[in-house]
């Protein structure tokens, strides 16, 4: 689509120059012919020169209107900011006061306005993808010998005319057919590679399944399973996923093949192919070229899908390697278990210094008792040998002698194995010998119980041994009576069998040691391989990250491809619709073209740009320089051409950057090929190493099977006396009971370990508590030391003040006395005055004594009882979310004296007439406005708005958008006169109230005092 847009802009420039040239004098030159001769006045019918072959006259400029948005100033608004006042001089720790200052800032709003713009569209009568469909078919036949002229070349994405770097599709039909053939060859090669990868993958999956099944059978069953055995479930799932991915790749390749076939059909016998072949100059087909480019992009996408499938295959291969590593670990663990079963673990005593004396004494006592049991077994063996010898002297050794010896040896091995786990636990106990001294003194009772249990076991074992001795003696006597033969031959035969068994046992021990060394070597090699595999895993993780980034880029390219395909389908539909229309307007367009041709013939102004160094500018102003990769003509509309040149340059830069991005993506994909080769080599080395390890493990298992088979044959040769099977079975049952006892001892040891762990946890807790208390004590001691220093300083200050006060008290603050003045002379006695008026009456005399009390009066009537003080008060909180408008039900009642508040409705009903104190605290969500009204008998009394006061007349100064509320808290507090039956509630108008277990939104009220006058009113 981008090259087509560039061609359209180029045609617009030429059409604009041709339209403006029609108003100049008639003498001139044609801009659209290849020759330089003057045009004849006879019109197109009388002209013998070749007809213009350009398609650039079918674009016209239209003036359109558009609505754009802009931001306008909408007055000012007032904001309040806090201003912290600084402390005065010499007052560093004063309480800072806050002053609030108001500021003015501009307010803006969004407005819309209509502007005009120029837009290039197809002229009337023209249509199609590049406005090439119109009345051109009725203008006359094309000349047979056109004059040579420079052929326009389609520019590439970078702005040059050398062709496209991405696809190379820039010209004629033969070049396009070659490109199609090249793309078909690429598709065929990709199909072959896909089939080869599929075959390799199937072979590897088959070999991997066989190897895994063989390894599992060898470890668990000790034999090879048949070839038709079932594989593991995980392998089937992996194979199904790989087959699905391969099927997806196959479907995409088939889709690309279908598109190539469709494209070939379009080029060979598509619509419009024959008509274009008869023209003088074949014009490149825009839709076919776009289809070829789209096909190339889809091929690149399919390549990326192939790479993604290869990455999935590598990931699956890594998972198979991890499974093989797990199987190797399982094999090593099974071999270790076999080694433990074949040879009992050797007891290893700890050093004498690791245990306390009490534990050593008890352990020695246990060892002594076990030695007694061992001695009893030895005596039993000796007695059995003597009795067998006597029987041989009478009638020879019985035939079941070797079987009895083997059964007794296995019995002794099982008895030793019951002691092995306890010794191994003692050896591997994580507490260590050094911690035994901490918990043994705290558990003497448990050790005594353990000793008692061991004594009972020893007694029971002794009884069973005596019974076993009697049974063996009877069996020996019976066998001696039944069996007969030469004593010398039987002795030699028994000695040979015993010596052969001893040699086999020694050989088995040596071979088991060799097996153990081989297992250690295999384990070391496995660790080395594990390190190598971990490194490969890190490399694969980095590759996976890079492929994820490439997948994101591919997804973006696919989105753009889909958009381009949608636009292409729309344009094809439009082209089909325009192709079906008739040419009814061809006559008018032909007349208009005739007038335009006459005007061009009468034009005498030079429109071409100056070619020589001395040529000056034309009438239309200075000529414009050529665009990047295009040739343009100068004209009178210089500003319009300059604007078009700028827009085309921006488009070319955009496509250049897209081309660079595609080159970088191609480089990255090429680098992935080298990484794939490295991974393939690493995979081959890992597979060879795994095969070598598997071969060694198979050989080792085969040798072990042969050795065990030899041991089983020896045991089968040794056991031929069926009379002792039942008794030895009962003896084995006793050994199983001893195994149960050993399990109980192990449980006791585990319980002691848990108690020790609990004791250590308590010790650690006590240590932490002690450290905390020590820190507190140190802090207290430091505070006491500082307190002593402060008290000393205070005492010194008091002593100093006392000294100063004493000094001040000793000072005399009275001033010096003045001189006494002389006494004055006595005055003369004056004459007596006239008598005055009579004075007021004198005071009353004193009251007389109280008379005797009178008789007792009668008792008055009983007064009215005191009125009870009513108790009316309530307080409730909100614990449920509330965002709908209406009465708020404060459901959590904190206080409700009298029960006059209903928590379900949130309404308080006044029981008495009087003065009531009502208060409420409404807390909303942050930056959300809350509005509420306090209603008395469904009449609003008070209103709160957490956003603050908002004046009327907002329609004169509208606000562009609502500003967030700075606060979300409202408070009611007022005293109301209420009559009996009046209701009080809070109605939510706007916002959402906060709810919590801790009260945030509260409604309270209380009766202050009654008012009877209010009740009468």
Curated annotation (Swiss-Prot):
Gene3D superfamilies for the chain: 2.60.120.40
Biased composition (Pro residues): 822-841
Ranges annotated as biased composition (Low complexity): 154-167, 811-820, 843-866
Biased composition (Gly residues): 387-398
Entry keyword Cell membrane: no
GO molecular function: extracellular matrix constituent conferring elasticity; identical protein binding; integrin binding involved in cell-matrix adhesion; molecular adaptor activity
Positions of the C1q domain: 867-1014
Domain Collagen-like per the UniProt entry, residue ranges: 815-865
Coiled coil: 171-211, 237-266, 310-374, 519-573, 676-697, 789-809
Chain positions carrying an annotated carbohydrate: 156, 416, 456, 562, 659, 767, 795
Phenotype upon loss of function: Dermal collagen fibrils are thin and curly, and collagen cross-links and EFEMP2 fiber formation are significantly reduced in knockout mice compared to control. Knockout animals have an altered bone microarchitecture with decreased trabecular bone.
Free-text function comment from the UniProt entry: Involved in elastic and collagen fibers formation. It is required for EFEMP2 deposition into the extracellular matrix, and collagen network assembly and cross-linking via protein-lysine 6-oxidase/LOX activity. May be responsible for anchoring smooth muscle cells to elastic fibers, and may be involved the processes that regulate vessel assembly. Has cell adhesive capacity. May have a function in placenta formation and initial organogenesis and a later role in interstitial connective tissue.
Subunit description: Homotrimer associated through a moderately stable interaction of the C-terminal globular C1q domains, allowing the nucleation of the triple helix and then a further quaternary assembly to higher-order polymers via intermolecular disulfide bonds. Interacts with EMILIN2. Interacts with EFEMP2; this interaction promotes the incorporation of EFEMP2 into the extracellular matrix.
Protein known as: EMILIN-1
